[in-house]
Amino acid sequence: TCSVKLYPARVMKRLLPPTIQAIATHPMFGPDSGKDGLEGLPFVMDNVSAHEETWRWWVDEFTSWKMDVLMMSCDQHDREAAWSQGITHFIGRTLAELNLGSTRLATKGYQTLMGVVEQTCNDPLQLFYDLQRYNPYTKQMRMGLRGALVTTMEALKEQEEIL
């Protein structure tokens, strides 16, 4: 999957012959987000083993598509993606388990949450599994989320005890 960088970059370095040039890329959008055009959408790149000339050519090519080309290491990508894409997919899949539906009382916030459910569950389930399994930082994200839920639940419990 494009959504994880460290694992596939390590595999490419280990398995590909040195004559093969490799660049790790991640368009930070899918079909839903890019359906109206690519302009301004983030596109991450890291040079795994490409020659400088090849690397520059691809950077220029993707830049010419008017995407926001972000050059960052695979490690930095996975760190940031765990807390952006990873948590979004985790929350979306978790909310989907609640089988929430439409309601006439839906606030804008609720509609936004339902949009997250729709967007993340529209992606293949394997993408979710890969994000959670192969990104070395998503476990830390999930543990942080669990801790935040516990803290919030405890704060509510304290407020209930005041009554």
Model-found features: residue ranges?
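Rossmann-fold dinucleotide-binding core
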Residues: 3-68
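Short linear Ser/Thr-Pro motifs
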Residues: 2-3, 107
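An accessory alpha-helical subdomain
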Residues: 68-163
